[in-house]
């Protein structure tokens, strides 16, 4: 990852052989998708990626129904499931509650954006989504590597925010900026 970061910083093209780029790994893409959805609730790609990861009982059938209904209504999936005056008719009961619990969780992350830096928000998201717990529970070599990769991403965010605090202590941007 250190080489990748250095090459990116210097705008040097590079190619990874025999593995994945750090930022192409599932666990990294998942946390970044949570960031994206926190900053932009209508990011459908991010929503579809993480709405049921870690597993929260929101399956393909529920998502297919929401996608069809949101297309028919010409609104985003987010707008469809958060409209209290005109809730979805294609998904109801326990399935709808699970989706609404998910949107409430994302809204709680958004409420933290103005007060947390990138690292603190990342830690908050990773903990409250269950990403850290899910990856920590997987004791296979791949699971341990995924957990380590997530920790490395969070450590990189910490280094970035610490460096930014040192150079401009009064002007550290938050994700909300």
Say what each PLM segment does.
Residues 17-25:
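Conserved helicase motor
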Residues 4-13, 25, 32-177:
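Conserved helicase C-terminal RecA-like lobe
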Residues 1:
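Acidic beta-strand-to-loop metal/phosphate-binding motif
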